[in-house]
Regions:
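Pepsin/retropepsin-fold aspartyl endopeptidases
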Residues: 1-126
């Protein structure tokens, strides 16, 4: 499967005076959380809520700032989440993708809203 990217809007819902940022994000269902580079956390004036330990792809562990809240928008979908500050690009993990009911389309290398629920996100609560 190649790399799948999508264009998302990130904003700080506690700071409506700050403009949202349009970003290209790597969508990875194998990752869990939203991860953003430090410069985006600064631009959105996101405060550190706590520190979290993360396990990186190479197996190393480190602690990183967990900031928020972050509003993530994609087409007619949005969610509110926190973000871990690390890396040099935006990484959209499974939690925000599930929250917005998004699907990955590997054949098109794209992110899309779930075609089975195009108007309203669906969640499973069993």
């Amino acid at each position: 499967m190649g790399l799948i990217r999508g264009t998302f809007s990130l904003s700080n819902p506690t700071r409506p005076d700050l403009a949202p940022l349009e970003v290209s994000a790597l969508a990875d269902s194998g990752a869990v959380h939203l991860c953003i580079p430090e410069h985006l956390a600064i631009q959105l004036s996101l405060g550190e809520l706590e520190r979290r330990e993360v396990v990186l792809a190479d197996g190393h562990r480190r602690t990183v700032p967990y900031v928020g809240p972050v509003e993530v928008r994609f087409r007619n979908r949005r969610c509110f989440t926190g973000a871990m500050v690390l890396g040099n690009e935006v990484l959209l993990g499974a939690i925000p993708m599930e929250d917005m009911d998004l699907v990955l389309r590997p054949q098109l290398q794209s992110v899309d809203v779930n075609p089975e629920s195009p108007n309203i996100p669906v969640s499973v609560a069993k």
